[in-house]
Amino acid sequence: MTKEKVFKKKSSILEWGKAIVIAVILALLIRNFLFEPYVVEGKSMDPTLVDSERLFVNKTVKYTGNFKRGDIIILNGKEKSTHYVKRLIGLPGDTVEMKNDHLFINGNEVKEPYLSYNKENAKKVGINLTGDFGPIKVPKDKYFVMGDNRQESMDSRNGLGLFTKDDIQGTEEFVFFPFSNMRKAK
């Protein structure tokens, strides 16, 4: 093999190596700062999100703080490997209260249309979907969350407590698996 062919072969290998390194760096940047896939574990968000569904999470809101009441958010648990998928209910400074299956934020009733299926099922068996609680004043720099499956969810009401902005990993963007059920959860 001539020196020219050896040089071209090494040059070609270097070009492929550069392309692979750039692709890996881009993938890491996208995953760490823009979007990341998550797997729903458990029943706390049924039927909005069901166990084993896979969703993409928009991580940009973690840096912009651009999340709002009603968003489905992914939270870090106390252990690094634990994540929770919950609905953002109370923002810093809010007063959260549940009376007779109606949510009140700062004294104003907040409609929760995403709970209609679960509320109908609870009424069929003669119970409220969500037990009364509060009023709870959400401290500065804290967030109050609940699962949509209020009977099955561990959340800010009953064990998980309140979360900080740093605990929020992002908002649910869309469900991508199973493919037959791709959608934007509401």
Swiss-Prot record:
Task: List GO molecular-function terms, semicolon-separated.
Answer: serine-type endopeptidase activity
Q: Which residues cross the membrane?
A: 16-35
| EC id | 3.4.21.89
Q: Which residues lie on this side of the membrane: Extracellular?
A: 36-186
Q: Name one GO biological process term.
A: signal peptide processing
Subcellular location, record wording: Cell membrane
InterPro entries the UniProt entry points to: LexA/Signal_pep-like_sf, Pept_S26A_signal_pept_1, Pept_S26A_signal_pept_1_CS, Pept_S26A_signal_pept_1_Lys-AS, Pept_S26A_signal_pept_1_Ser-AS, Peptidase_S26
- Catalytic center residues: 44, 86
User: What chemistry does it catalyse, as a reaction equation?
Assistant: Cleavage of hydrophobic, N-terminal signal or leader sequences from secreted and periplasmic proteins
SUPFAM superfamilies of this UniProt entry? LexA/Signal peptidase
Look up and give the membrane topology term. Single-pass type II membrane protein
EC class name = hydrolase
State which ranges are Cytoplasmic (membrane side): 1-15
Which CDD domains does the UniProt entry name for this protein?
S26_SPase_I
Question: Per its UniProt entry, which superkingdom is the organism in?
Answer: Bacteria
State if Transmembrane is listed as a keyword: yes
Chief site of localization: membrane
Its GO CC terms are: plasma membrane
Key words, A-Z: Cell membrane, Hydrolase, Membrane, Plasmid, Protease, Transmembrane, Transmembrane helix
- Transmembrane helix: is it a keyword of this entry? yes
Query: Which family does the record assign?
Result: Belongs to the peptidase S26 family.
Q: Write down what this protein is called.
A: Signal peptidase I P
User: What is the native source organism of this protein?
Assistant: Bacillus subtilis subsp. natto
